[in-house]
UniProtKB/Swiss-Prot annotation:
Its EC number is 1.5.1.5, 3.5.4.9. Keywords: Amino-acid biosynthesis, Histidine biosynthesis, Hydrolase, Methionine biosynthesis, Multifunctional enzyme, NADP, One-carbon metabolism, Oxidoreductase, Purine biosynthesis. Homodimer. This is Bifunctional protein FolD. One of its GO terms (biological process) is L-histidine biosynthetic process. HAMAP family: THF_DHG_CYH. Pathway: One-carbon metabolism; tetrahydrofolate interconversion. One of its GO terms (molecular function) is methylenetetrahydrofolate dehydrogenase (NADP+) activity. One of its GO terms (cellular component) is cytosol. The gene is folD. InterPro entries: Aminoacid_DH-like_N_sf, NAD(P)-bd_dom_sf, THF_DH/CycHdrlase, THF_DH/CycHdrlase_cat_dom, THF_DH/CycHdrlase_NAD-bd_dom.
Length: 281
């Protein structure tokens, strides 16, 4: 018997229904939420991501603001654009689409964002607030993972969660989210230096694969009935491919497809962060 699908698209649609109502209430009170994006260059993947985010905005009634810049812009020009959005009253929250061209400092750009307009939840100040468990915009992908598990009644409290990948956007903040008292999971954070990874994953109730290595998590690494969340994305023969081997579906109890699992929720919680920032004003 195959695993239950952790359907990110259906869950996203549920979130959008709620967001549309909340945006309507904000509009009635004279507060219109606005999401801005800064896109530098013409990377096809980045362009597609940005188009998708603005399409999502239209579905729930959030105002879209775009700042598309040429690939050869100077740091000063990028900084001016960030400062303009920091001061723009129509912009509730915004993101700098990554990756940036190599001559631009991504960390410096992210740090220049007003933490109160950090739609991605990745500003150093807001990551620090996550460590301290104080209110702040939460990183979108980790938040989406937790929501998806809850939506399908996968037990989190007391569960052993093995997270593969220590990146700033997923692995590190996910561990912080899952160990809050509201989640109460025990987290093992694995990476390229982890010895005997399979021994650890076979002990897990929940596995989150977020390394970007195609099909690296195989069926023999998964305990029967475990929940598996596939976050990593690679291109193989021109097609998007996740970190989880197809055979895992025959062993696991729940699996998120990739694409179609966590990705839609990352975008949904980007909008959620913007709506929440508007509600707090």
């Amino acid at each position: 018997m195959g695993a239950i699908t952790l359907d990110g698209k259906a869950t996203r649609d549920e979130i959008f229904v709620d967001l549309k109502q909340r945006v309507s209430e904000l509009n009635a009170s004279g507060r219109t939420p606005g999401l801005a994006t800064i896109l530098v260059g013409e990377d096809p993947g980045s362009q597609a991501y940005v188009r998708g985010k603005h399409s999502d905005c239209a579905k729930v009634g959030i105002t879209s603001i775009r700042r598309d810049l040429p690939a050869d812009i100077s740091t000063a020009t990028l900084n001016e654009t960030i400062d303009e959005l920091n001061a723009n009253p129509d912009c509730t929250g915004y993101i700098v689409q990554l990756p940036l061209p190599k001559h631009l400092d991504e960390n410096a750009a992210l740090e220049r964002i007003d933490p109160g307009k950090d739609a991605d939840g990745l500003h150093p100040t807001n990551l620090g607030r996550l460590v301290l468990n104080t209110p702040a915009p939460l990183p979108c992908t980790p938040r989406g993972i937790v929501h998806l598990l809850r939506r399908y009644d996968v037990p989190i409290a007391g569960a052993h969660v093995v997270v593969i990948g220590r990146g700033v956007t997923v692995g590190r903040p996910l561990g912080l989210l899952l160990t809050r008292r509201s989640e109460n999971a025990t987290v093992t954070l694995c990476h390229t230096g982890t010895r005997d990874l399979a021994t650890l994953t076979r002990q897990a109730d929940i596995i989150v694969a977020a390394v970007g290595v195609p099909h690296m998590l195989t069926a023999d690494m998964v305990r029967p009935g475990a929940a598996v969340v596939d976050v990593g994305v690679s291109r193989v023969d021109g097609k998007l491919t996740g970190d989880v081997h197809p055979d895992v579906w025959e062993v696991a109890g729940h699996v998120s497809p990739n694409p179609g699992g966590v990705g839609p929720l990352t975008r949904a919680f980007l909008l959620t962060n913007v709506v929440e920032l508007a509600e707090q004003r």
